[in-house]
From Swiss-Prot:
It comes from Psittacid herpesvirus 1 (isolate Amazon parrot/-/97-0001/1997) (PsHV-1). GO terms for cellular component: membrane; viral envelope; virion membrane. Coiled coil: none annotated. Residues 1-27 are annotated as: Disordered. Seems to be required for glycoprotein B-induced fusion. It comes from the Viruses. Belongs to the herpesviridae HHV-1 UL45 family. Residues 1-20 have a biased composition (Low complexity). This is Envelope protein UL45. The chain crosses the membrane at residues 111-131. The gene is UL45.
Amino acid sequence: MRPNGARTQTAPPPAAAEGTADVHGNGEAATIQLDGQPSAPSPPLTTVFEATDDYKARRRNLESEPPFEVRAILDDELSDYPVAAPLDAVPQKHSCCCGVCLRRCAFVLTGMAVGMLLAAALLATIAAFAVPESVWTGGVCERGWVQHMGVCYKPGRTPPPSSAADGNFSAATFAGANTNCAAAGGSIVSSDQALSFLVLLSKTASGPNSAPPRGSWWTTHSGSCAIVHYAPSSTLEVYGNTSSLQSLALRTRDALDVSIAEDTQCSGSAGVMCAAAPAPPTALKYAQALRAILTLGVRAE
């Protein structure tokens, strides 16, 4: 029994017997467990890696290279992109060297011409058989000619009045009339043609500055020369209320003094009036000729 207040002191366990030895061979001491007793923990070992020459070279290369962004900018600046240069600095390329361009242009133009000719021939062939028969007999008058009743008329020389009292006119002889009409591309009108055309001119001459074609005109009648004297007259007739200007009407009544005077010697002078048949257009002429050629070919077969 222990009296109250007495303390009991426990003796520490006996220390284990330890020894040290140079195990690693580098001068460091290591704890060796003796007699199966646990030893004190040894300090941590430090592992040291020694870099090779290859690794050192790669590291130096990486450290010497700039960052990726800088390298991207440098690569873009050093790239071989086309740069706009002044015209003087760029050598001009002569594409027409040795006539290559000229031959190419000539080939293209020749092809276009051949294509146009083939298209024109095709259209002419279609027109040669598609145009009705009535068109072949008609046509148009040239500029300066007036078409009336299927005939082209042209006054070669208008007869000027020699005397206002008698209304006689003088222009040219019959030979001169023939010469004028031949130069204009026609011939002297017949008496029937002259009357038809003069009536038309009289009806259309209704303006203040125009006058009916009064006068004498050379014509051909029954195979001989003749003169037609044309003298129309106008009368003013009043219809309805005379107080209104709208009720006035001007009518032309032709009083034809047709004196077809056959002159065997064709002497004297008169006005010149030419007549010609209307000619079909040029394209229609080619189509008509092509139609005739093709028709002959079909008949020959």
